[in-house]
Amino acid sequence: NAYVDENSPAVMNFTKADSMVAYAVENGLSIRGHVLAWDADMCDWFFREGYKKDGAYVSADVMKNRLKMYIDEVMTHFEEKYPGAIYCWDVVNEAVADNAGEFADDDVRHVRQVRGGKTNLFYDYIGSDYVELAFRYAYETREKLQAANSKTNIKLFYNDYNTFATYGANKRDAIIQLVKSVNSFESDGNGGYLKLCDGIGMQSYIGGYGQQSGCMNDNDITLVKNAIEKFAENNVEVHVTELAVRNYDNDAEPEHAAFYKKLAQTYVDINKAAQAAGKTGPITSLSIWGLFDAPYLSTADYSYKMNGPYCGLFTELYQPKQSFKEVYEVLAAE
């Protein structure tokens, strides 16, 4: 297996992922690849000799090669087996820290060194430029695959949450600095730089976390709008990912519907304004995380806090809510 070193006999297993991708292809669904590098969800043994829990940590050079080969193998597997099915890969997920003390003081990118008290192993064993390197590796594989098959058309994205946050450490602006760094990392040989990152994925959990207070706040729409426009100024696309308009009170459905309508209209207006200026609308994809209500969730459940039990456009019985009707009318008018 190409991504392992001489002491590493590990083999990739795509069985579960293949079953999901095959189902999507059979049903005419496009796929977002998520995610190639994420510090929160990569096993410690990935960084050790022989991929063994008790192995010594490998050198930075070995880890760079390991990450490169891992990214290449994953992307190549799915593109060769399901040509054209994947429209985008989230190359790196949630690498920007939320708070001071979680990143180096002199790092304008705010690349996280710790998460919840645990160190970022990519940062520790590859280096502070692991994000840029991951994008370079993904770009090289993408170019190889596109040269081999005209069906391949993959965009490379950086994905994160709280992307519209300007409080505290100002995550929005740090994300911009990170993407700037990625897109000025590799020379194109002609005095410019290769555009390694095509866009920013905006995880969009909007509203109070785990509580009704803070939900359906129009100021959040303003922050979202400002963030999208800032990202577009830096010549990248925007994908709205994991959209969930939080709502913890079923009786607040009228307010939820009105807020969803304003949000949908804001997305439309942003693209229309760009088009009126002779540009392409920056929002090129939208994925809804909270599509259906889930009133059965316990208040202690992570999904209860993250999404809200009444965040859906549909009820738990798959019936369209007023929120769906309002969003549909906004989109149908375009």
Language model: regions and residue ranges:
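Solvent-exposed, well-ordered amphipathic alpha-helical segments
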Residues: F14-D18, A22, E26, D198-G199, ...
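Short, acidic/polar
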Residues: A17, L67-H77, A169-D188, V224-A227, ...
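Substrate-binding cleft and catalytic face of glycoside hydrolase catalytic domains
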Residues: N1-T163, V236, V245-N247
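Aromatic-rich peripheral "rim/lid" segments of glycoside hydrolase catalytic domains that contact
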Residues: V4-S8, T15, H77-E80, G84, ...
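Short glycine/serine/threonine-biased micro-segments
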Residues: I31, G199, I288
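Noncatalytic carbohydrate-binding groove/subsite architecture in carbohydrate-active enzymes
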Residues: D107-E253
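Short linear motifs at secondary-structure transitions and domain/linker junctions
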Residues: V62-R66, C215, P254
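Short, solvent-exposed loop/turn and secondary-structure capping segments
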Residues: C43-W45, A100-F103, A169-N170, Q212, ...
